[in-house]
């Protein structure tokens, strides 16, 4: 074998490795999805909250460290950095950190900053938070935000962030190369599976975060924004748009008499009601809770149809059951529409 042929073969093998040896007929990825490296407007707040959650919020000393230890080597290093940084904070800074996140959640602060430019500085972030009336900050907390985040970034976070940023930007570039080279439209795929036409014009944007154990989702205008952990794969990215697009499908019938009637009957379902009550009713009313179980189940089904990923875990009460139901009936919109499939499924839950 001459050297030229060897180089060609090696190039082909490297392409298969990069794409995970997937058959493009089975797994295709939407090039409308964009992956970015970490940005300060997210990671500064998110990482400060991790320190708060580990050392201040976790008053019961629950073994959160197990979540980091069970993730990856980088996750363990990140956990050690969080521990070391907290130990170096003086009592005044710890109190300011506590005041900040007792006043608002990490999500609320990042949501306030999410439409800032990706190159925004600490000063830009602080000024935005202080001026945001929706956060309803007291003058004391405004001062805490200004003092703490500037100190935290200058003394600890800036060096750590820049050290991690380069490698995560390289990962983002690799994922984008895969996404762009497999130019398939998720919306068109859903239209084919469901037999309906969507026109959502959503733009899905992902930002790598330093947090290895959790993610956050945000929306503004037509943008769907999610943070992703450092070990996220291309397949993981698809689950967010699948869930969001599913909501658009359910919007076509979630106010229909038939759907509202089944939601009323489900108020007799002890398990569904119990989990709903335990969630403090903050995110949904009961009808929306019934819908959310179906949406999550349907998004799982879409992911299965798209990538052949088989689910065995539940996020709500009936999402996994609905996913399995759709697989069992081999859901076909030419035979049964989505609304009828949802109502038929919930009727089996009520009958049981």
Model-derived features: positions:
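Active-site recognition of the HExxH zinc-binding catalytic motif
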Residues: 235-256
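Pan-zinc metallopeptidase signature
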Residues: 297-352
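Sec-dependent signal peptide recognition
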Residues: 4-11
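Second-shell loop/turn segments in exported
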Residues: 171-180, 228, 280-286
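C-terminal motif of bacterial Sec signal peptides marking the signal peptidase cleavage site
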Residues: 17-20
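Long, mid-chain structured domain cores
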Residues: 84-181
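Auxiliary, metal-adjacent structural segments of Zn-dependent hydrolase domains
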Residues: 160-218
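Post-HExxH zinc-binding segment in Zn-dependent metallohydrolases
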Residues: 26-108, 253-320
């Amino acid at each position: 074998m001459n050297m030229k042929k060897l180089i060609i073969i090696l190039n082909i093998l490297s392409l298969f490795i990069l794409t995970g040896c997937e058959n493009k007929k089975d797994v295709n990825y939407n090039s409308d999805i964009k992956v970015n490296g970490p940005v300060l407007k997210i990671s500064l707040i998110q990482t400060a909250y991790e320190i708060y959650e580990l050392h201040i919020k976790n008053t019961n000393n629950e073994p959160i460290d197990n979540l980091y230890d069970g993730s990856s080597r980088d996750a363990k290093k990140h956990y050690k950095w969080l521990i070391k940084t907290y130990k170096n904070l003086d009592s005044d800074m710890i109190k300011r950190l506590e005041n900040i996140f007792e006043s608002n959640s990490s999500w609320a602060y990042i949501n306030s900053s999410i439409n800032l430019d990706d190159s925004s500085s600490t000063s830009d972030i602080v000024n935005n938070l202080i001026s945001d009336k929706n956060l309803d900050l007291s003058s004391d907390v405004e001062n805490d935000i200004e003092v703490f985040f500037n100190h935290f970034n200058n003394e600890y976070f800036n060096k750590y962030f820049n050290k991690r940023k380069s490698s995560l930007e390289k990962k983002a570039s690799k994922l984008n190369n895969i996404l762009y080279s497999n130019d398939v439209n998720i919306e068109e795929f859903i239209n084919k599976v469901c037999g309906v036409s969507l026109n959502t014009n959503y733009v899905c944007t992902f930002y790598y975060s330093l947090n290895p154990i959790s993610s956050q989702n945000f929306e503004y205008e037509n943008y769907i924004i999610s943070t992703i952990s450092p070990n996220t794969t291309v397949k993981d990215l698809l689950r967010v748009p699948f869930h969001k697009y599913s909501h658009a499908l359910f919007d076509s019938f979630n106010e229909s008499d038939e759907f509202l009637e089944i939601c009323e009957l489900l108020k007799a379902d002890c398990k569904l009601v119990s989990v709903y009550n335990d969630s403090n009713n903050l995110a949904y009313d009961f009808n929306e809770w019934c819908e959310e179980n179906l949406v999550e189940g349907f998004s799982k089904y879409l992911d299965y149809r798209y990538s052949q990923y088989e689910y065995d875990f539940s996020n709500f009460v009936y999402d996994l059951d609905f996913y399995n139901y759709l697989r069992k009936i081999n859901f076909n919109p030419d035979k049964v529409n989505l609304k009828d499939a949802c109502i038929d499924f919930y009727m089996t839950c009520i009958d049981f």
